[in-house]
Amino acid sequence: MDSSPDLRTRIAEFLSQDLPATNKQGEAAIAMAAGHEGEPELPGTYVDYEAGPREYELAVAQTILRVHTRVADLYNGPMDQLEQQLRLTVEALRERQEWEMLNNRDFGLLHNADSRQRIHTRSGPPTPNDMDELLSRRRNTRLFLAHPRAIAAFFRECNSRGLYPASADVDGHHVPAWRGVPIFPCGKIPVTDQATTSILAMRTGLEEQGVIALHQTGLPDEREPGLSVRFMGVSDQAIARYLVSTYFSAAVLVPDALGVLENVELGHA
């Protein structure tokens, strides 16, 4: 630091700032008095959820769908060609949205778990003990999210111990579960070249102070919540163009809403 006057100046400026008081979790402190006698003047306070609250900017996924007017005019039976192509386009955008909500460096869940909510496997493969520790880090865990190969690796560990996990009923469908918490497969969770991956556990919903999805409703030409289809006109080649856009993000309302089991070994393919 002695060799860099600019760095020394910036550090001195930072240390001289009047930073807001925080508790040991880094949350904005609430001023209070306790154990006093007589009639002292009580402190006043504003309740700030965080000393420096984060602002989320909605991400966007977009594409331009091109449909030749001849196709729309002549081949609309028995299926509406425009509607079918829009359906496929929307599905592709939703798939990309899911990938971004997991892997985006800014707001993706894999990159936004608190360091205290990240744990490593005990021996490599995902064992029942690992899943129990991941589960114990939060209240009201709603779901696990894991790569299909990670689920298979976990079941192998259960079988080797003579354990047979039950299933959970979700909207009339039976899905794998552990301790009554459903395990949903997700192929968008990355697998490294060393055949390792991660397993997520989360509490969801605004009322539960969990993980929530963010989107904007009331868009012009809205087709679904947070997704719009805007007609851009017809080109000189008689090709109709539609701008398909979806806006989204994700937020972890409190640190213990999301946990990640890291370095999960999948074994041999």
Named regions from a protein language model:
Residues 71, 95, 150-152, 189, ...:
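Short loop/turn segments at secondary-structure transitions that flank enzyme active sites
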Residues 113-177:
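Extended, solvent-exposed, turn-rich assembly/linker loops in the middle of proteins
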Residues 63, 140-142, 179, 240:
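Structural beta-strand/beta-sheet cores of well-ordered domains, especially the beta-sheet scaffolds
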Residues 1-4, 8, 75, 124, ...:
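Intrinsic-disorder-associated interaction segments
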Residues 1-65:
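Assembly/oligomerization interface modules of large self-assembling protein complexes
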Residues 166-269:
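Sequence/fold signature of self-assembling virion shell proteins
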Residues 48-73, 84-92, 101-104, 199-208, ...:
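A glycine- and small-residue-enriched flexible loop/hinge signal that marks low-structured segments
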Residues 62-140:
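Alpha-helical scaffold segments that mediate packing/assembly in large oligomeric complexes
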